[in-house]
Every structure is written in structure tokens, then in C-alpha cells.
Regions:
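Conserved Radical SAM active-site core
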Residues: 1-70, 74, 84-85
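Auxiliary Fe-S-binding modules of radical SAM enzymes
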Residues: 112-229
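Alpha-helix-loop-beta-strand connector modules within alpha/beta enzyme cores
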Residues: 39-51, 99-110, 181-190
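Short glycine-enriched, charge-decorated loop/helix-capping segments at active-site entrances
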Residues: 2, 89-94, 171-178
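Anionic-ligand binding region
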Residues: 88-119
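Conserved radical SAM core fold
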Residues: 33, 58-61, 79-97, 126-128, ...
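A cross-family glycoside hydrolase active-site/sugar-binding cleft signature
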Residues: 25-29, 51-57, 78, 127-131, ...
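Non-cysteine beta-strand/loop elements that form the S-adenosyl-L-methionine
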Residues: 69-84, 154-163
Length: 229
């Protein structure tokens, strides 16, 4: 009974969002999966109808993801590195490549390719984010080639150019700068070369747009109309 009461507020909150002008519920939840599953099971009979978006680095166990089969509608997954050397050095994840790829395979098995409604709003499917990093650290060619070969050329891919070095990254010669136009162009050419059919690519220069300024009274990010490309 104590467990049920602990999750009741989450279920009620989800239902309130479902009745408001909201298109989905997104969360980075890996360490709260059992609680999330219970909250959703309680919320659905109360009227929850929104797609649930699982926002993840992809450093998840397949066993954990299987607990979410039929619960999560959209997986928003990172594919950060193609080399465990960089996963170990920069993310303290020595087995990032194997673990993230196994996780993405399981996510795709559950939800498949991205499905949108008549207004273009995502309702179900997998979206893979790939952040372009300086000096080839992200292993973009290997990562994207793996996606096309092992997942699907139709999987939705979000190629991001917004990397901006802060804090300790500024002290690393490999990470201390934003990506160059040449690095951006090299990855953009991979879209056609590898036959990636669906997705988006940020414009060059997005790193400044997505750098939060918490001293702004109107919020940490500029309004959409203020962003200059």
C-alpha cells in the first residue's frame, strides 16, 4: 500500500498533463524505470493518453528496456561514440559502444521507425540523436553506417552541430572548440552517401543558440524569433 501511495501523485500529474495542451511526456528516467512503469499503469485508467518519450544516453541495459516494452511510445536515444576509448575517457563508460548499440536495437524492436500524425507530431518510434564532436571523436561515419546497416536506413536521425565546450571540456585539446565547417560538411555528406532516408540536421552555428544563459530574466534560451542562423 505504501508503494501505491508513493506513485499516486505521478499518476495524477500525468493525467492533468494529458488533459492540457500537451503532445507528449518526456523524461530521462533510467534509474527510475520501476517507478515509472507503476505510475503509468496507474495513470492509464485515469485517462492518460499521451505518448511517453524516453530520453536517454542509450547507456541502458537491455533488461531494463524490456520492462518498458508497451509503456514507452517514443525513444529519444543518443549515439555518442563509435570507440570505447572515447567513451571511457570522456563519459566514464568503457563499454559504451556495445551497450548503446544493444540498447538501440532493443528500442527499435519495440517501437520501430518514427510515426507522426497529420500535423507532423511524433506519436511512436525511435529517434537517434548524434552529436557531431570535434576531431572525429564521435566516430560519425562508423556510428551512422552501423545505424543504416544494423537498424534501418529509414530510422529517424537527428544530426546535431550544437556542441559547445564548457567546464572541463575547455581544458581538453580534443574538445576545447566547436566543430569546424569542414567537420560539419563531412558529416552532412554522409546522409546521402550512406542512404539515410529520414531525419534532421542542425544548421552550422547552433552551438551558441543552445548555450543556456541563466541570468536571462525571460529564460535561459533566446526566443525562437531571436535566434539568428
Amino acid at each position: 500500500m505504501r508503494w501505491r501511495l508513493a506513485f499516486w501523485p505521478s499518476a495524477c500529474s500525468s493525467c492533468r498533463m494529458s488533459s492540457a495542451v500537451t503532445t507528449s511526456i518526456s523524461f530521462p528516467p533510467s534509474h527510475f524505470v520501476p517507478q515509472i512503469v507503476r505510475a503509468v499503469l496507474e495513470a492509464v485508467p485515469l485517462g492518460l493518453r499521451l505518448p511517453l518519450v524516453y530520453n536517454t544516453s542509450s547507456y541502458d541495459s537491455v533488461a531494463t528496456l524490456r520492462e518498458l516494452d508497451g509503456v514507452v511510445s517514443i525513444y529519444l536515444a543518443d549515439l555518442r561514440y563509435a570507440s570505447n576509448k572515447w567513451g571511457r575517457r570522456f563519459s566514464k563508460a568503457p563499454d559504451y559502444v556495445e551497450r548503446s548499440r544493444a540498447a538501440i536495437k532493443e528500442m527499435y524492436r519495440q517501437v520501430g521507425n518514427l510515426v507522426t500524425d497529420e500535423e507532423g507530431v511524433a506519436r511512436k518510434g525511435l529517434i537517434v540523436r548524434h552529436l557531431i564532436l570535434p576531431n572525429g571523436i564521435a566516430g560519425s561515419r562508423d556510428s551512422l553506417n552501423w545505424l543504416v546497416r544494423e537498424i534501418s536506413p529509414r530510422v529517424a536521425v537527428s544530426l546535431m552541430s550544437q556542441y559547445f565546450p564548457v567546464h572541463r571540456a575547455r581544458r581538453s585539446p580534443l574538445l576545447a572548440r566547436t566543430i569546424s565547417p569542414e567537420e560539419y560538411d563531412e558529416v552532412s555528406r554522409l546522409v546521402d552517401e550512406l542512404g539515410i532516408e529520414n531525419g534532421w540536421m542542425q544548421e552550422m552555428g547552433a552551438s551558441r543558440d543552445y548555450l543556456p544563459d541563466f541570468s536571462r530574466e525571460a529564460g535561459p534560451f533566446p526566443a525562437r524569433e531571436d535566434v539568428k542562423r
